[in-house]
A protein has these predicted regions:
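C-terminal scaffold of the Radical SAM
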Residues: 1-156, 209
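Short, amphipathic alpha-helical interaction segments positioned at domain boundaries
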Residues: 189-210
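A short, conserved structural fragment
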Residues: 172-182
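Minor-groove-contacting beta-hairpin "wing" of winged helix-turn-helix DNA-binding domains
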Residues: 183-187
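Short amphipathic alpha-helical interaction segments
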Residues: 157-173
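A generic structural-conservation signal
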Residues: 48, 160, 180-181
Length: 210
């Protein structure tokens, strides 16, 4: 259940849309809530904050088993170490980091026709990046995370997130999250806004390099 992203500065064809006829934030929230309630009334189980599946779907089974994952395409049932992006602007995941193809369709075609990769840029992940990625993934998949457990799994025992907890406390006061030592749980009220809680652990947002 994806919301429409109006980015005319990036997608120039969107400039043809009369913005005065677009729903405002309150209307978008109401539409999302109605769609959410309708899908759940029909027997669909909510997966994360934007996916829905039948109760016997592999994605629901992965959710119950704590094995749900998330990639650039959304939620998934397989934690693949490598995800290859094929088309223009597609993002690929490698054990070492991420790569992205050139966005221009013509340039992409020329690279492929010449037998070359159409990769335009990439980024290598540090140990800190991998730790934060795991925390964000658990928050978005399980709506909960044990910071100590994730840190231990990444060989970073004793890692503390003081600044992140300050931000989370603001959300806790609004009833969106609950904090219990090193454990974080996103409440039912906060689930539609799970990305806000997860963003507390994204250091690249503050630098403009996300």
């Amino acid at each position: 259940l994806f919301g429409y992203a109006h980015v005319p500065w990036m997608k120039t064809h969107q400039r043809l849309i009369d913005e005065s006829r677009m729903p405002d934030a309150a209307s978008r929230w109401e539409l999302m809530t109605l769609a959410n309630e309708r899908l759940r009334s029909l027997g669909y189980v909510q997966i994360g904050f934007d996916h829905f599946a039948k109760a016997d779907d592999p994605m629901v089974l992965a959710l119950k088993a704590g094995k749900l994952t998330r990639n650039f395409q959304g939620y998934a049932v397989e934690d693949a170490a490598t995800l290859i992006g094929l088309g223009p602007s597609a993002i690929g995941t490698l054990p070492q980091g991420y790569v992205q193809n050139v966005a221009d369709t013509g340039a992409w075609h020329r690279a492929i026709a010449a037998g070359r990769l159409a990769t335009a840029r990439g980024i290598a992940l540090s140990d800190e990046d991998r730790l934060r990625r795991a925390i964000i993934e658990r928050l978005l998949c399980d709506f909960a995370v044990d910071l100590d457990a994730v840190a231990r799994a990444h060989g970073m025992t004793g890692r503390r997130f003081a600044q992140e907890k300050v931000r989370l406390n603001d959300l806790a006061r609004d009833g969106l999250v609950e904090l219990d030592g090193e454990r974080i749980r996103i409440t039912e009220l906060g689930r539609p806004l799970a990305r806000i809680a997860a963003a507390c652990f994204d250091t690249y947002l503050d630098t403009g390099k996300a």
